[in-house]
Amino acid sequence: RDMEPDVIFFSDAGPGVRWVGNERGVAGETNWNTITPDTLFAGKAGIEKLLNTGSENGTHWIPAEVDVSIRKGWFYHAEEDSLVKTPQQLFDLYLTSVGRGSTLLLNVPPDRRGLVHENDVAALEGFRALLDSTFKTDFALNKKVIASSYRGNSKHYAPANLTDNNASTYWTTDDEILTGNFE
C-alpha cells in the first residue's frame, strides 16, 4: 500500500475483495458484502459456501468477486471457438454476479494472433445489446422517495437525490444516526 494506496487485494479473505468460492460465475442468492475474515485464508478447505454468501453480521466489508471465462477454460484453444458462451449465457452470468452485489471478472483470452476471436467479440456485442435493452428505462428516475431522516433536513441531502440521475447528489443522515432507511 505504500507504493499504491488504492490497490485492492484479492484473496479468499480479502482484504479488498474475496473469491466467491467457485469459477462458475455465480454468487449466492443471498450475498452479503460483509464477512469475518479472522479464520479465513487462501486455500482453506470447506469455506466455499461462506465465500459464496458472505456473513450477514460480518465484521469487514469484503465484497465477492465472481470470476468466469467466456470460454470453456481460461486460455484460448481453437477447438473451443464454437463453445463461446452466448449473449444470453453472459447476461445470465451478469444477473447471478453483478445482480447479486458482486463484481464480475469475465476472462476473455486472446487468440494465437493476440486478438480477441471474432466469436468472442460477437458474444460480447450481443451481451452489450441485451444489457442496453434490459436497462434502457430507469424506473426509479424522479420517483418520490421517503426516508427515515436526512442530514439537517437540507435539500442537499434529501431522499429525492436518490432518484435525480445526478451523480454528484446523494442522500445521507445526520452523523449521529448510524442506520437509516428509505422507500
Residue ranges and their predicted role:
Residues R1-N161, N166-L178:
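Mature catalytic domains of secreted/periplasmic carbohydrate-active enzymes
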